[in-house]
């Protein structure tokens, strides 16, 4: 599920999210390969993930990058038929603002 990533991030260009299953993270390369925005998760059960933390460097905030990370993580949860525990406040906010049925039915009660 890894996507190609542009060498540098054009503020008006597409944001591409990479999924590193081994490191259990979604990331967006910023400014070449030095800066990254990341969303970290852990498996807390066989079919349950804890979406723990989203971080975007200060210089890149306000551009919708965290929203792309949250969407990629929730789409992963749906595609893999997992349950999600939302520890990260930003992902809680994302799901509240985007209450899609496929997201809501995959939330851990």
Swiss-Prot record:
Disordered: region residues: 1-20
Domain N-acetyltransferase span(s) in chain numbering: 18-108
InterPro entries membership: Acyl_CoA_acyltransferase (IPR016181), Gcn5-rel_NAT (IPR045057), GNAT_YJDJ (IPR031165)
Homology family: Belongs to the NATD1 family.
Protein name: Protein NATD1
Originating organism: Xenopus laevis (African clawed frog)
Protein's gene: natd1
